[in-house]
């Protein structure tokens, strides 16, 4: 069973967070990391250390695992074809989701499948979105379906 999980990491100035190997995308919602500024994202699959800048950082982190997690902001079981190649893709304020994933409202409010979601509230994709809000999401797409559309970050994953 594959799970996609979203975490919200609130890092104090200079604080570090060690991450185990595994497919992930990190998005800096505010502040900065040593190598990434607010509004930017990065894909990674190796061990990593996130280090907050002088003002700290709020980091949204999506991780793909083969198990369930209890400590995530939101976790969703994702059915994937074990024989297909996939990629994790991070996008902001895009149209319909190209695959299953998890989104997070950054500013404003969105109505997601009839439910009001406020800033830093999370939702499972695909979903029907309406309202005046800004969001970021990570979706899983088949590698052959990656198009030229702009992504904040993306990378191949191996199941």
Spans of features found by a protein language model:
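Short acidic-glycine-tyrosine-enriched beta hairpin
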Residues: 32-50, 111-129
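A short hydrophobic beta-strand segment most commonly corresponding to one strand
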Residues: 2-5, 55-73, 124, 133-155
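Short, surface-exposed beta-edge/turn micro-motifs
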Residues: 22-25, 56-57, 99-102, 119-120, ...
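Intrinsically disordered, low-complexity linker/propeptide segments enriched in Ser/Thr/Gly/Pro
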Residues: 27, 39-40, 91, 135-138
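Residue "hotspots" at secondary-structure boundaries inside conserved domains
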Residues: 9, 17, 26, 34, ...
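A short glycine-rich, His/Asp/Glu-containing loop-to-beta-strand
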Residues: 1-22, 62-101, 143-145
């Amino acid at each position: 069973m594959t799970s996609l999980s979203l975490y919200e990491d609130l890092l104090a100035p200079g604080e570090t967070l060690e991450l185990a190997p595994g497919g992930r995308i990190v998005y800096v919602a505010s502040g900065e990391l040593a190598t990434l500024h607010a509004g930017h994202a990065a894909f990674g699959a190796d061990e990593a250390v996130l280090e907050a800048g002088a003002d700290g950082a709020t980091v949204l982190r999506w991780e793909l695992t083969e198990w369930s997690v209890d400590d995530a902001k939101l976790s969703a079981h994702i059915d994937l074809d074990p024989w297909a190649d996939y990629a994790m893709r991070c996008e902001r304020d895009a149209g319909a989701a190209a695959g299953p994933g998890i989104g997070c409202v950054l500013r404003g409010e969105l109505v997601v499948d009839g439910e009001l979601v406020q800033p830093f509230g999370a939702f499972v994709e695909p979903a029907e979105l309406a309202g005046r809000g800004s969001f970021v999401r990570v979706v899983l797409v088949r590698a052959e379906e990656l198009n030229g559309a702009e992504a904040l970050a993306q990378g191949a994953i191996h199941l």
